[in-house]
């Protein structure tokens, strides 16, 4: 195939739920849909744009769901790179555009991603605000992660945003650790928040025992 593939992720930082890495393959960088960084859009605006993206015959949308146990096993950076690599190899675009991760040089990033020869790589800070094809990927990733978290809440009850800064999420983690709930598998055990709360719960159980 050919074209430009914008790639972005949602859910890199939360202690709960998956990370979703999305790719949008388009004939060119700009789509003319008015897409911009998903973090700047309301939920209703994201829904409107996701419908437009999914129904646009010029575009091919793909995604990879990275579950918490994968992140715990591989680390978030490696898991993200593997997801990006998978999306690129399925689409084989002429060009890939994504947010520049950390202090990676273009040469090191290309090595880490193991991109096939001939694919042009553009990695820039705030690429999701500069290139509409990356904005579109950002919208897809954010929308799908929100849907997954919502489905989990429908089954297990409120979890909150999933971020370590959300008291609802931390409180739910604490309750699940106390009772060994099934929902625990959707929390990232390698996160400092998980380790801290787990330590608190164990300490409290010891105090209650004595």
From Swiss-Prot:
Its cofactor is Mn(2+); Mg(2+). It catalyses: Endonucleolytic cleavage to 5'-phosphomonoester. It is found in: Cytoplasm. A divalent metal cation binds at residues 8-9, 99. Its EC number is 3.1.26.4. Manganese or magnesium. Binds 1 divalent metal ion per monomer in the absence of substrate. May bind a second metal ion after substrate binding. Disulfide bonds: none annotated. Coiled coil: none annotated. One of its GO terms (cellular component) is ribonuclease H2 complex. GO terms for molecular function: manganese ion binding; RNA binding; RNA-DNA hybrid ribonuclease activity. Keywords: Cytoplasm, Endonuclease, Hydrolase, Manganese, Metal-binding, Nuclease. GO terms for biological process: DNA replication, removal of RNA primer; mismatch repair. It holds the Pfam family RNase_HII. Belongs to the RNase HII family. Endonuclease that specifically degrades the RNA of RNA-DNA hybrids. This is Ribonuclease HII. It comes from Methanopyrus kandleri (strain AV19 / DSM 6324 / JCM 9639 / NBRC 100938). The lineage of its organism: Archaea, Methanobacteriati, Methanobacteriota, Methanomada group, Methanopyri.
């Amino acid at each position: 195939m050919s074209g430009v593939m914008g790639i972005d992720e949602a859910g890199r930082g939360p202690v709960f739920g998956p990370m979703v890495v999305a790719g949008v393959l388009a004939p060119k960088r700009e789509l003319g849909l008015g897409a911009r960084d998903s973090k700047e859009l309301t939920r209703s605006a994201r829904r409107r744009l996701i419908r437009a993206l999914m129904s646009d015959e010029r575009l091919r949308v793909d995604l990879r769901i990275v579950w918490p146990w994968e992140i715990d096993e591989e680390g978030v950076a490696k898991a993200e790179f593997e997801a990006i690599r998978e999306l690129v190899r399925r689409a084989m675009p002429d060009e890939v555009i994504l947010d520049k991760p950390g202090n990676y040089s273009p040469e090191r990033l290309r090595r880490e991603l193991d991109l096939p020869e001939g694919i042009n790589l553009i990695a820039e800070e705030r690429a999701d605000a500069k290139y509409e094809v990356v904005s579109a990927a950002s919208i897809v990733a954010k929308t799908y992660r929100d849907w997954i978290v919502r489905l989990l809440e429908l089954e297990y009850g409120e979890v909150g945003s999933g971020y370590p800064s959300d008291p609802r999420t931390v409180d739910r983690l604490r309750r699940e650790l106390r009772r060994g709930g099934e929902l625990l598998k959707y929390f990232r055990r390698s996160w400092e928040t998980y380790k801290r709360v787990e330590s608190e719960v164990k300490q409290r159980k010891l105090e209650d025992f004595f």
